[in-house]
Amino acid sequence: MKKIVFGITSLGIGGAERVLVDIVNKLQDEYDITIFTLYGKGAFEKELSNKIKIIRLYDNSYEAMSKIKKKIIPIKVLISGKSIYKKYIQGKFDVEIAFLEGPITRIFKYGKSNKKIVWVHNDIAKVFGDNFKAKLKLKVDKKIYSKYDKIIFVSKDNENSFNRIYSDIPNLGQKEEVIYNYIDKDRIIEKSKAEIGQEYIDKNITSIITVARLVEQKAIDRLINVHKRLIDDGIMHNIYVIGDGPEKENLQNQIKELKVEDTFKLMGKRENPYPYIKRADYFALLSKFEGYGMVIDEAKILNKKIIITDTAAKEAVKGYL
């Protein structure tokens, strides 16, 4: 049985993390699978089959790390990536897959086999910005991606974005492939049946929901502004946001300033967002950019009407709207 290792920052709540758990659980009987993470105690770890092994660089979750450690660990990975690879990965697996952009790619690039794969989930042209630091990082990352035998993208737009930045990577066309995210439809439908209280999603008024990390990319601030304008125009509705992140305090302040506390709800993290999505009338994703937007596919499975901005996530609604 072939041995495969997938590398990812953590198995905390997130789109790529969700996809990885679904993939390895699906493949568990065909391959000997290990997941290598930088951080432990991710919420999705408990959803892994007991056949899947986990190697953790650190046992603690990212959230439990001190501010200093959060800054030091990525630097350590950059400096010590080769020694980390030798200790945990080298010679132990037939196929090595860096499943997410960032620190993991800096470790797995040292693989010697011809089965070294990297997965790209984000819009590379937009995720880093346009300042000097971003341009330097893109230059470094070009050398890293050049080391891989195969580069997998989650959408065609995702691939096109990558090619605009890294068109001069040797043999790039031969390395590239688009593989859309695998989603366990039955799992989503089953989890959507869980009971939630009426106080969470009020069915007496039109409801819009989104599931996203509270980061600038997801543009929740834009959603708040649109919500306020609609309320002022007499279009009454509630908006619910499932997720957490560094922009939470700023968003809370914006909600308070616009006096929409009663109609715009930040609900925090939910390990099972599906019953909330199922209960809402619409699903919205107003991101500035996306690699694909897997959550749109999940909302479609639950028969939600979709509100979306013009990003790579629009591929998910072709033929649907």
Language-model segments: what does each one mean?
Residues 129, 163, 172-204:
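Acidic anion/phosphate-binding donor-loop and adjacent secondary structure
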Residues 106-108, 148-175:
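A short, active-site helix/loop in glycosyltransferases that binds the activated sugar's phosphate group
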Residues 14-22, 206-229, 246-252, 294:
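A conserved mid-protein helix/loop that constitutes part of the nucleotide-sugar donor-binding site
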Residues 96-104, 120:
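Short His-centered aromatic/hydrophobic patch
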Residues 82-92, 134-154:
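Membrane-proximal helix-turn-helix segments that form the acceptor-binding/catalytic region
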Residues 269, 288:
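Aromatic "clamp/platform" in nucleotide-sugar-dependent glycosyltransferases that forms part
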Residues 6-13, 26-72, 158, 168-176:
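N-terminal strand-loop element at the rim of the active site
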Residues 252-268:
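Nucleotide-activated donor-binding/catalytic signature segment of Leloir-type glycosyltransferases, i.e.
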